């Protein structure tokens, strides 16, 4: 059955399907929208007591429901200066060192950090010998993405690609999954060197958004696009630790890349398949801070 599911993913018109779902999710259909939201809550056992608006009727569209805010204080932020926090609610897929420009995806599968970053060689070089972490956001999860540490945006790259599902089954069976799906790469300058936040698209993900650019995709592009940003002066975009940096409409994956020597150790309990909650301790930082 697993082989059939994977084969279907290769055959389906994934972009067309995703855009169709996106249009439906954006529709404000009154009682029909409310019914769909109620079904989704029941199907995925979503705890609406955490949401700022807990009643399904409060959401005019499915997208509004899916990108719902949480109640203030529901995800306390670890403010220890030597701690990096989880950027999302989800589950760790994999994490570890970047070796010879390769990132571990699943047993028998690695992929290139250069390809992940849209073939931006200078960017890939900055993360050689560093660490990575891949976090999967299931449909039930809170889908806003936050900063693990304070950073100033220096570059954003849109990379066109496939829209395979990014669930654990697909990660185990589709080679180079995260480096072949459509994605948005945001690079920040931090006290510990560069930080890459890679927002990976997936089947029926209606859009990828950032707080500084709004909706980046759709529309789907056919070539790599890059935007550069000032890191100093009044136009610099600096986001604090825990501040929202983007969001998905429907579930997907975030891949983080860290500079060499940025991370001392991952926090206790942070390992493959571990559940993550935004704001909790993710990693212990090196004592010696540097600028790239």
UniProtKB/Swiss-Prot annotation:
<keyword id="KW-0444">Lipid biosynthesis</keyword>
<feature type="site" description="Cleavage (non-hydrolytic); by autocatalysis">
    <location>
        <begin position="251"/>
        <end position="252"/>
    </location>
</feature>
<dbReference type="GO" id="GO:0006646">
    <property type="term" value="P:phosphatidylethanolamine biosynthetic process"/>
</dbReference>
<keyword id="KW-0865">Zymogen</keyword>
<feature type="active site" description="Schiff-base intermediate with substrate; via pyruvic acid; for decarboxylase activity">
    <location>
        <position position="252"/>
    </location>
</feature>
<keyword id="KW-0472">Membrane</keyword>
<keyword id="KW-0443">Lipid metabolism</keyword>
<dbReference type="InterPro" id="IPR033178">
    <property type="entry name" value="PSD_type1_pro"/>
</dbReference>
<dbReference type="InterPro" id="IPR033177">
    <property type="entry name" value="PSD-B"/>
</dbReference>
<protein>
    <recommendedName>
        <fullName>Phosphatidylserine decarboxylase proenzyme</fullName>
        <ecNumber>4.1.1.65</ecNumber>
    </recommendedName>
</protein>
<keyword id="KW-0210">Decarboxylase</keyword>
<keyword id="KW-0594">Phospholipid biosynthesis</keyword>
<feature type="modified residue" description="Pyruvic acid (Ser); by autocatalysis">
    <location>
        <position position="252"/>
    </location>
</feature>
<dbReference type="Pfam" id="PF02666">
    <property type="entry name" value="PS_Dcarbxylase"/>
</dbReference>
<feature type="active site" description="Charge relay system; for autoendoproteolytic cleavage activity">
    <location>
        <position position="89"/>
    </location>
</feature>
<keyword id="KW-1003">Cell membrane</keyword>
<keyword id="KW-0670">Pyruvate</keyword>
<comment type="subunit">
    <text>Heterodimer of a large membrane-associated beta subunit and a small pyruvoyl-containing alpha subunit.</text>
</comment>
<dbReference type="InterPro" id="IPR003817">
    <property type="entry name" value="PS_Dcarbxylase"/>
</dbReference>
<dbReference type="GO" id="GO:0005886">
    <property type="term" value="C:plasma membrane"/>
</dbReference>
<keyword id="KW-1208">Phospholipid metabolism</keyword>
<comment type="similarity">
    <text>Belongs to the phosphatidylserine decarboxylase family. PSD-B subfamily. Prokaryotic type I sub-subfamily.</text>
</comment>
<comment type="function">
    <text>Catalyzes the formation of phosphatidylethanolamine (PtdEtn) from phosphatidylserine (PtdSer).</text>
</comment>
<feature type="active site" description="Charge relay system; for autoendoproteolytic cleavage activity">
    <location>
        <position position="146"/>
    </location>
</feature>
<feature type="active site" description="Charge relay system; for autoendoproteolytic cleavage activity">
    <location>
        <position position="252"/>
    </location>
</feature>
<keyword id="KW-0456">Lyase</keyword>
<dbReference type="GO" id="GO:0004609">
    <property type="term" value="F:phosphatidylserine decarboxylase activity"/>
</dbReference>
<comment type="pathway">
    <text>Phospholipid metabolism; phosphatidylethanolamine biosynthesis; phosphatidylethanolamine from CDP-diacylglycerol: step 2/2.</text>
</comment>
